[in-house]
Amino acid sequence: MKALARFGKAFGGYKMIDVPQPMCGPEDVVIEIKAAAICGADMKHYNVDSGSDEFNSIRGHEFAGCIAQVGEKVKDWKVGQRVVSDNSGHVCGVCPACEQGDFLCCTEKVNLGLDNNTWGGGFSKYCLVPGEILKIHRHALWEIPDGVDYEDAAVLDPICNAYKSIAQQSKFLPGQDVVVIGTGPLGLFSVQMARIMGAVNIVVVGLQEDVAVRFPVAKELGATAVVNGSTEDVVARCQQICGKDNLGLVIECSGANIALKQAIEMLRPNGEVVRVGMGFKPLDFSINDITAWNKSIIGHMAYDSTSWRNAIRLLASGAIKVKPMITHRIGLSQWREGFDAMVDKTAIKVIMTYDFDE
């Protein structure tokens, strides 16, 4: 079968390669991939050439499919079930994070479809979910409810991230306002979570390149206002829209240093920033404001079983909308077109399906 693989250790590019179909062990589950989505985490390796031919991983950690095989010792899953993976492949099972069910904060975690794994990912025909993870973490897989299709289920990862950031990590109360910085899937699902939870003003901050595609979708999904950070004073505009006493929560999804600076500045005293986006440059500004005005910066990583259980119910109920965000549906053989669309921001979410003849 074909698979889109990454090569090199720290950074490296992608190649479409031939790989054998995974062998199902006695405790394993093999999924036939029905839909896989390109994530922002996949983009950092696109058009990168490390000069290395060392295999790293089959990519694609946002995927859903149908169980094709189960090992003889597997009791909880059956061939034919429609499932979505939370992309856990390995955790230690004994650290404080694992004991709390926060498996993706395990320092020994290995994710399916991400770096340095041998089990596989969504950018192929089949992916193996190892029995070792299913013994520790049964909810490494979730059954897809009736009425939810594969492409919607494939993007439950960012939905669950948005759920956890607002519903579980922040102290948000209905009737307050929320600013979301960033217009990718994490940002747009955060808009929907803020709407569901009863925010009055939901302000989305983006850039000039978001005006054509992403701003209109943000409004369709519940944003009450958009702010163009390329042409407007972000802090002043957000405070003007919300009023200085109502802006208690900023969900920062871009990872840009300037965005974190703006988020801290615009908050009212005792406000919170949940930092969902990840940047790679040292901070170049003072954060004394968080001490002077009792503001909080909350780090965010992934989700837990509560996030998944409730996000799946919201998706099945129709409260969460995915279709407006799926801008491209392509075969895996056209993967470069999908990545290019992500680069130029004509895409929000790209869904790929396996289209190679065996």
UniProtKB/Swiss-Prot annotation:
The cofactor named in the record is: Zn(2+)
Instruction: Name the source's superkingdom.
Output: Bacteria
Q: What's the EC number here?
A: 1.-.-.-
Residues annotated to bind Zn(2+) 2: 92, 95, 98, 106
Cofactor binding: number and manner: Binds 2 Zn(2+) ions per subunit.
Keyword field contains RNA-binding: no
Which enzyme class, named as a word? oxidoreductase
Q: Does the keyword Zinc apply?
A: yes
Q: Which UniProt keywords apply?
A: Metal-binding, Oxidoreductase, Zinc
Which InterPro entries does the UniProt entry name for this protein? ADH-like_C, ADH-like_N, ADH_Zn_CS, GroES-like_sf, NAD(P)-bd_dom_sf, Zn_alcohol_dh
Q: Where does Zn(2+) 1 bind?
A: 39, 61, 157
**Gene Ontology molecular function: any one:** oxidoreductase activity
Q: What Pfam family is a match for this entry?
A: ADH_zinc_N
Q: Which family does it belong to?
A: Belongs to the zinc-containing alcohol dehydrogenase family.
> Could you identify this protein by its name?
Uncharacterized zinc-type alcohol dehydrogenase-like protein YdjL
What is the gene called?
A: ydjL
